[in-house]
Amino acid sequence: MTALLIDGNALSKTLRAQAAERAAALTARGHQPGLAVILVGANPASEVYVRNKIKACEDNGFFSLKDAYPATLSEADLLARIDELNRDPKIHGILVQLPLPAHIDSHKVIEAIAPEKDVDGFHVANAGALMTGKPLFRPCTPYGVMKMFEAHGIALQGANAVVIGRSNIVGKPMAMMLLDAGATVTICHSKTRDLAAHTREADIVVAAVGKRNILTADMVKPGATVIDVGMNRDDAGKLCGDVDFAGVKEVAGYITPVPGGVGPMTITMLLINTIESAERAAAAA
């Protein structure tokens, strides 16, 4: 049995077309959705991510603003800029590209963003509200994974789900969203004693640790859904995920590729969060 491929590019295209329609409707009413992206320092990977986010905005009728600063920018100056953007009615989403230089406290920076403009869903107000199932914004990567389950009719209620990884950006919110959807959730991580014992019982496995081949074919229950959030490089320098794709695809029922799986969905859900913010602002105007 070869797994069915969950194509993130195709689903992204559909969702971005819907976002573009919503953006056009808002713009016609004088409320063009706006996203501000802040980049501090010259991290090549961050520059690529920011470029992709800005392009996605431009391609879908959003207003976008990119602030690029040298790595020497002071924390106080960054916080002052965020305060300006919080008060700018043209901006509905504020995103600070992580990681930040060592002298800047990323927690303080995230908490400085107004919760109603926190389109990454990292602010403590949104992270806390995720516990009750009522956040203003859901973090983009796990939100995109949930859309993948929905698009393919993958049943979550009563399913055994294993999330490998416990980051605030993916692992923890992913577990909360799966729990909210009625799954029985286990969170595994680097200190888990016998990872395979957990994954072999799972109907759904989400791998999000940033470590190649953390999940191999012998660790997967036949017919399981495997979502690969990892972004790594193989020995030849090619992009790969956390999952041994060649092996696991022969056992799983559904699998996401890397690239072309979860990656495109992350930026798509950023657009969806920004449009929702703009719609709320327009309704309150």
Curated annotation (Swiss-Prot):
Belongs to the tetrahydrofolate dehydrogenase/cyclohydrolase family. HAMAP family: THF_DHG_CYH. The gene is folD. Its EC number is 1.5.1.5, 3.5.4.9. It catalyses: (6R)-5,10-methylene-5,6,7,8-tetrahydrofolate + NADP(+) = (6R)-5,10-methenyltetrahydrofolate + NADPH; (6R)-5,10-methenyltetrahydrofolate + H2O = (6R)-10-formyltetrahydrofolate + H(+). Keywords: Amino-acid biosynthesis, Histidine biosynthesis, Hydrolase, Methionine biosynthesis, Multifunctional enzyme, NADP, One-carbon metabolism, Oxidoreductase, Purine biosynthesis. Gene3D superfamilies: Leucine Dehydrogenase, chain A, domain 1, NAD(P)-binding Rossmann-like Domain. GO terms for cellular component: cytosol. This is Bifunctional protein FolD. InterPro entries: Aminoacid_DH-like_N_sf (IPR046346), NAD(P)-bd_dom_sf (IPR036291), THF_DH/CycHdrlase (IPR000672), THF_DH/CycHdrlase_cat_dom (IPR020630), THF_DH/CycHdrlase_CS (IPR020867), THF_DH/CycHdrlase_NAD-bd_dom (IPR020631). The keyword Transferase does not apply. NADP(+) binds at G165, R166, S167, S190. Pfam families: THF_DHG_CYH, THF_DHG_CYH_C. One of its GO terms (biological process) is tetrahydrofolate interconversion. GO terms for molecular function: methenyltetrahydrofolate cyclohydrolase activity; methylenetetrahydrofolate dehydrogenase (NADP+) activity. Homodimer. It comes from the Bacteria. Pathway: One-carbon metabolism; tetrahydrofolate interconversion. Catalyzes the oxidation of 5,10-methylenetetrahydrofolate to 5,10-methenyltetrahydrofolate and then the hydrolysis of 5,10-methenyltetrahydrofolate to 10-formyltetrahydrofolate.
